[in-house]
């Protein structure tokens, strides 16, 4: 069974944790930006069907 030989230093642990947090932050920013562009109708990659509010006569 594989066992680490030495304890990971606190600074290395902090660097890895911050990198992991940064990846999550950028994923959230990208998702929010995409949602904003879809809601404003400026998205070029999604086609949203627009429903009209006119009543049929």
From Swiss-Prot:
InterPro entries with a match to the protein in the record: Ribosomal_bL32, Ribosomal_bL32_plant/cyanobact, Ribosomal_zn-bd
Single Gene Ontology BP annotation: translation
Ubl conjugation keyword on record: no
UniProt-listed Pfam families: Ribosomal_L32p
GO molecular function annotations of the record: structural constituent of ribosome
Alphabetical keyword list: Chloroplast, Plastid, Ribonucleoprotein, Ribosomal protein
Top-rank taxon: Eukaryota
Compartments, as annotated in UniProt: Plastid, Chloroplast
GO CC field: chloroplast; large ribosomal subunit
Stated family: Belongs to the bacterial ribosomal protein bL32 family.
HAMAP family, sorted: Ribosomal_bL32 (MF_00340)
UniProt-recorded name of the protein: Large ribosomal subunit protein bL32c
Organism: Acorus calamus (Sweet flag)
């Amino acid at each position: 069974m594989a066992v680490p030989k030495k304890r990971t230093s606190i600074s290395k642990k902090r660097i890895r944790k911050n990198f992991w947090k940064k990846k999550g932050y950028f994923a959230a920013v990208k998702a929010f930006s995409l949602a904003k562009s879809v809601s404003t109708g400026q998205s070029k990659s999604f086609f949203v069907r627009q429903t009209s509010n006119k009543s049929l006569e």
